Every structure is written in structure tokens, then in C-alpha cells.
């Protein structure tokens, strides 16, 4: 199915009580779900894509869903408990290729979808600490039961290290100013421990606003990525994902910022090329054959979807198919 055909596929409406994921119709079209196929939703969230896959599967089809967020897992287990076609895994993205292979799925997956970033329920719950628009503890962990919160990270790092995080993971031009403001507040005995406290610090530190963007946007992105090791998780996931796919199996990844999308783009490019071979080797040896074929160009949300869901503006869907 071409990129144009993916975009043209009519999107099924989720029910009034469910949230439509970004690029819902395009992602499901990209997977080209067969009724008897085996599919993986690597980032369940609240199950929007999973429901769409299940609607297209027959009685012999199988769906594996995974997430590392305990609330998402509880939702999946409650919602999918009565469907014998489904298996729910609690797993970080990086662990998923190994866990699925242990379940006997190596070279057996017909389609795998990864919708990167945070889900709407995570953003909307102030207790999770992801949003600068709602006051709550400065947490930002995808799994609140493990690891270091954003507040703890900011209390531990030096100004130089905080600036490095903001610059590298948020592409923040004012990283130095913001880092110094955070450390000054910390030294004064008032470190940012809530989302609004951090947002106010950033607003005061940044000399001018970008039109249409809150000054704290890049800071919150950078801290979330750092707290959850999102880029490391993505890299390790991509390293093992091809071996899961059956020949002709599809990989579909939705990214929400350039740091993620560049990684996915480079991965597909490398896996779909044979590299630089000397002229004396006119036919690539077996070990150098391309393993993926990119399907069309990157896909983005149209104006109608962006109007209904502003988060869709930055989403990019890339699709590739395993060759052998």
C-alpha cells in the first residue's frame, strides 16, 4: 500500500468514550492488518490503536500489547481480559524485542506499531507531572514505581549538566539561563518540586517568548526524555525489532519530535541499504543485503486532524517492510 493509499483509507471513529490516537487511520492502514495475522502494539497507552487492530483481526489473529506505565497496563488488562486473541506485557520499549522473542514471536510478527512519546491520560493527570499547564509534583516518570523523578534529577545535577540536558534533549537555546535559574532557586532553599514552579522559573529566565509556544515547552520535553531514557529506549528497541518481523511484516513508528524522528529515519535508511561496497563486489553478499524496504515518504496529520488535536501537528509516521 502506497503512502497516498494509507492517507486515503477512511478512519474508523473510536467510540465517544475513547480517545482517538494521532494518525489513527494512517497507522492502521500502514499495518495492513490480515485477519489471521500476528500484531504488536508496543505502546498501548489507552488502547486506541489496539482496538483498531482487533476490529480488523479474525478469530485466528493475535495481538500483543505492551506498556511500562502501570495505569496503562491496568487499563489493558481490564479492557482486554475477555479477548483470547490478546496478550498483555508489562515492558519498557527496549526490553520488548527480547521478551517477544522469548514468547516465540521471532520472525513471526506481521505488523508492529510504536506510538512514541506521552499519552493524553499521562498529560491530563496532574499527579504525573508531565504538563506545565497543570500543577502537580514534578515527576515525569512513565513508571512512577521506579527510577528518578524530574525533581530529584534537578536537585542532583550541576548547572552545567542541567544545561546539557536542556540543550541536547530539548534543543533549548536558553539552556544556560534556565539552568542557572534552577540552581539559584535550589541554592536559595526553594528548588522546583512542582510543575508550575518549574514553569515559572523558566518563564522568568527566558528573555522572550516564541510565538505560539510556552517558554517551558522545550525544558519539559528535555526533562521527560532524560528521566525516562526515551532515546536510549528507542535505540535499543530498533536494534532488535527487525528480527521480530516476518518477511513482509510492517514496522510503523510515530514520532513527535525531531530527536526521535531522526533516529527512526536513519535506522530505516541503514536497514534498507547495503552500505558502501567496493567495485570489486558487484553483488552484495548475503550478510550485506538490505533487510527493510521503506514504504512511501513520512506521513503527517492533515489540517482537519490538527484542528481537532493540536498534538498531531508534530507527529510523523514512518513505515518500513521486512524483506527477508
UniProtKB/Swiss-Prot annotation:
In this chain, S-adenosyl-L-methionine is annotated as bound at 47-49, 67, 96, 115, 122
Tell me one GO molecular function of this protein: rRNA (cytosine-N4-)-methyltransferase activity
EC supergroup of this enzyme: transferase
Q: List the subcellular locations.
A: Cytoplasm
Annotated InterPro entries: RsmH (IPR002903), SAM-dep_MeTrfase_MraW_recog (IPR023397), SAM-dependent_MTases_sf (IPR029063)
Q: Name one GO cellular component term.
A: cytoplasm
Chief site of localization? cytoplasm
> What EC number is given for this enzyme?
2.1.1.199
- GO biological process terms on file: rRNA base methylation
Q: What is this protein called?
A: Ribosomal RNA small subunit methyltransferase H
Q: Say what the protein does.
A: Specifically methylates the N4 position of cytidine in position 1402 (C1402) of 16S rRNA.
